[in-house]
């Protein structure tokens, strides 16, 4: 099991957390004491949306984002596993619309 450093850029500042490659980023953030937005926890809405600015994730469990949004770097943190060290700007739901 690999572990990666995930930098989360929130409206309140930056936080770096450790996240294993079999843990969703939202879950790891909550375990680290961070309060990120979420609703369905199933990849079927956009409440937890973020934008990845460096690195990569596996969000194959998501069913909400279209191909253009994924190509633009949007990620649903509730169903995203890190596949490298990465940086994600959180609280991006409004940017999707």
From Swiss-Prot:
Query: What are the binding positions for [2Fe-2S] cluster in this chain?
Result: 40, 45, 48, 78
From the UniProt record, which GO molecular function terms apply? 2 iron, 2 sulfur cluster binding; electron transfer activity; metal ion binding
**Where does the 2Fe-2S ferredoxin-type domain start and stop, copy by copy?**
4-94
Q: Which PROSITE patterns match?
A: 2FE2S_FER_1, 2FE2S_FER_2
- Indicate the transmembrane segments per the record: none
The record's cofactor note says: Binds 1 [2Fe-2S] cluster.
Q: What is this protein called?
A: Ferredoxin
Transcription regulation listed as a keyword: no
Q: Which cofactor does it need?
A: [2Fe-2S] cluster
Q: Which Gene3D superfamilies does the record cross-reference, listed alphabetically?
A: 3.10.20.30
Q: Which domain of life is it from?
A: Bacteria
What this protein is reported to do is described as: Ferredoxins are iron-sulfur proteins that transfer electrons in a wide variety of metabolic reactions.
Query: Which keywords describe this protein according to UniProt?
Result: 2Fe-2S, Electron transport, Iron, Iron-sulfur, Metal-binding, Transport
Q: Name one Pfam family in it.
A: Fer2
PANTHER family registered for this protein in UniProt: FERREDOXIN (PTHR43112), FERREDOXIN-2, CHLOROPLASTIC (PTHR43112:SF3)
């Amino acid at each position: 099991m690999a572990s990666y450093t995930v930098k989360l850029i929130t409206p309140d500042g930056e936080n770096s957390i450790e996240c294993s490659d079999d843990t969703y980023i939202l879950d790891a953030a909550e375990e680290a004491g961070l309060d990120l937005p979420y609703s369905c926890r199933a990849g079927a809405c956009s409440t937890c949306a973020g934008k990845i600015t460096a690195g990569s994730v596996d969000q194959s469990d998501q069913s909400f984002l279209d191909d253009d949004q994924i190509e633009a770097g949007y990620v649903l943190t509730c169903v995203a596993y890190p596949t490298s060290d990465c940086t994600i700007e959180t609280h991006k739901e409004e940017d999707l619309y």
